[in-house]
């Protein structure tokens, strides 16, 4: 099963629900705001930085940044593999830079100070755990080469009473060893925001 099936799933969600949280398969709007805030905290108050929203969907993270006046000190760009998301973002935000590419096929994008991946790795759909892990780690390695300061991403937690077969639950220990061996020992695990997932910040130094 190809990881492209995940992109098709999100395309189906957008066609069914339109430009809202359901269109990117987030069930609760209020939870999306929590996730946006957690992603933004990767910057730790750093200003005048370039930021890539990898798997930007419908540009909702930029809308969050703007509504909180965070956009004034971040040079935002978005990237998505999904053609519908890309075209919608270009129409909504013609003054911003968006990329439509599969980074595992074509990684010809510039470097950014920070990269955030919000919801990019939370669903595996029909992929096996091993297939999703291969996709996940391959993308992280690509992104690590494209960031100057740090990246943030979220995955589903295994510290739950039960797991969903279509979601990507990752052991914190397993992930920690991958990060240490392939990216950096300088990482922070955020498991403090009451959702059944966790967010990881990985810093260059």
Enumerate the predicted regions with their spans:
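Class I SAM-dependent methyltransferase SAM/SAH-binding core
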Residues: 52, 60-97
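Conserved beta-strand signature within the Rossmann-like core of class I S-adenosyl-L-methionine
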Residues: 147-155
């Amino acid at each position: 099963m190809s990881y492209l099936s995940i992109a098709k799933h999100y395309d189906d969600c957008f066609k069914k629900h339109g430009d809202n949280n359901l269109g990117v398969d987030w069930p609760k709007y209020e939870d999306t705001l929590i996730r946006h805030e957690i992603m933004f905290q990767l910057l730790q108050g750093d200003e005048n930085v370039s930021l890539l929203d990898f798997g930007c969907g419908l540009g909702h993270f930029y809308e969050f940044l703007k509504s909180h006046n965070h956009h004034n000190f971040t040079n935002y760009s978005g990237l998505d593999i999904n053609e519908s998301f890309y075209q919608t973002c270009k129409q909504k935000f013609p003054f911003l830079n968006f990329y439509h590419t599969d980074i595992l096929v074509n990684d010809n994008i510039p470097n950014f100070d920070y990269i955030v991946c919000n919801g990019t790795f939370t669903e595996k759909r029909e992929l096996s755990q091993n297939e999703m892990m291969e996709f996940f780690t391959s993308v992280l390695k690509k992104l690590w080469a494209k960031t100057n300061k740090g990246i943030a991403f979220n995955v589903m937690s295994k510290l739950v009473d039960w797991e969903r077969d279509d979601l990507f639950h990752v052991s914190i220990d397993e992930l920690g060893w991958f990060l240490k061996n392939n990216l950096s020992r300088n990482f922070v695990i955020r498991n403090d925001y009451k959702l059944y997932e966790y967010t990881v910040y990985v810093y260059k130094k």
